[in-house]
Amino acid sequence: VESLGMICAEDEIGVGTSHDGIIVLPEDAPVGQPAAEYYHLESDWLIEIDITANRADALGHWGVARDLYAWLKQNGYETSLHRPSCDEFVVDNEDLPIDVEIENTEACKRYACVSITDCEVKESPKWLQDKLNIIGLRPINNIVDITNYIMMAYGQPLHCFDADMVTGHKIVVRTQPEGTKFITLDGEEHTLGEHDLSICNAEEPMCIAGIFGGKGSGTYETTKDVVLESAYFHPTWIRKSARRHGLSTDASYRFERGVDPNGQIYALKQAAILCKQLAGGKISMQIKDVYPEPMQDFPVRLNYEYAHRLIGKEIGAETIKNIATSLEMKIVKEDAEGIDLLVPAYRVDVQRPCDVVEDILRIYGYNNVEIPTQLKSSLTVQGDEDKAYHSQNLVAEQLVGEGFMEILNNSLSKTSYYTDLELNKYPLENVVKVMNPLSADLGVMRQTMLFGGLESVARNINHKSQNLKFFEVGNTYLYNKEKWSEESPIKAYSQEAHMSL
């Protein structure tokens, strides 16, 4: 029998998220009508942008728009940069005031919150679900979806608490005693310590700050009152804590790279406005904003001659100034040699003159810098390291000629290799430990190349490879506490070059 169609579930053709069964159309559905037209689907463009690790400011649609605006201005397009106003943010009552105390001001530079009462937690409207679905986020409920929407729009992570969990009507930002047990939203138990920042009520922690919420403190269908959080946490604290607990979320991804320290209030107001519109809530307190030491813009002195030399082309002072101002850098002083700039605090990657030049060249266009007719170079003289590298290559080529294959393993290794073996000549006390391990399996630097080589052998055997002959060139690392001293603690650490077969 010839088949002119196919049976589909909702998620297979993009009209829903259900995969429970096939779509059954009513009898009056017009035969031959395009499915997109029948389901009132609108076409849209999804642009995937690779953001480099240093561009934390671009981890949101607003940040990308800022860059696009600067490029359009540079290329002669008449355009403007604007975002929704906060005029609709109006405090309805003072029924649910929340106090805030920051005990650890190093880890938490700013913390703001607002309470919303009489909310109806329910499914988000279709337009909001569509916007989240198209960027790969799963809709949960209207309150949680609003926080995710604001995060993706402006790059500021938010968190929402059930107000009933905020006992004492007070939020305290602090670390916990070593060994404190905490269960996250996914039901996993974690052990907190003095290096883990947490958001607490008057009695207990409710959330691992900037990373993961606690079980029972989230927003559910029975929730009526919520507290919205908008904060700035120190990137290093969040990064180390996330690695320590093996947690990675959209929020931690942004916090550990550095969010805009002056964008918390705008994001909080926009979220509160949406809560009123989509959940019928009432704003029940003035925004509580604790910001002990406001973070300042970065002062940078940029000389025109330096910029032209680094770019490799004289693009002119006016072009430099126009691009700098379009990137929201303020010119505070100008003379014949250059300009004094204030770089926005959200540009954590632009703190030196060379960083400013890189930003200017990026907007000006690398392709607009012509290749010069003369290229400058410097003479180099081979030293002992070059000779050693040459000798290493000769040996490697000889081994390859004999049928060996070169492997390259990670210098990071499992801690268990130095603790679980009964007859281990590489004691744990001599390993170089990593302060912020990428994972639980990569917690120390290797003392020997043996374990990495055996891993490669095992992996290849499991893939049915035969006649395995490997060699590897690399370093091993050793810690000798007997050589440690306060005057020169680095003497306790050493590395050696090895070739293993």
Label each PLM-derived region with a short phrase.
Residues G32-T52, D95-I134, P235-F255, E293, ...:
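Residues forming anionic-ligand binding surfaces in small-molecule and nucleic-acid pockets
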